[in-house]
Amino acid sequence: MIDFDTDSDQIKAKAEEQMVIVAGFMKEYPETTALVAGHTDDVGSPAYNMKLSQRRADCVMNTLITKFGIAKSRLSAKGYGDTRRLEYNTSAEGRKKNRRVEVWVDCVLVKN
């Protein structure tokens, strides 16, 4: 999970480690695909948050492509706005946990 500041689509430096893990797994298992899912807190209008969440997802997806060499055909990005919260948005801590991108990797591991 990659967290974001309020009203920002900029990836924080501390997210590098998480991106390395995702990219490493996808390189080790080249048949995998991933959904990059962007989310927001409930500050702002639903329409604005939908666009912000999409920008966050696009930013993470583009970083996986350009910095880590993951093929674009293996990735898709979707913004969910504030529709899939992890916590209630009634506190600063709750809102912080909802400002995130999740990368869901789909794969089938075959035992030899």
What residues fall within each predicted segment?
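Acidic/histidine-rich, surface-exposed loop or edge segments in extracytoplasmic proteins
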Residues: 1-5
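Sec/Tat-exported extracytoplasmic proteins
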Residues: 23-26, 30, 67-68
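Periplasmic OmpA-like peptidoglycan-binding domain that tethers envelope proteins to the cell wall
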Residues: 10-16, 37-112
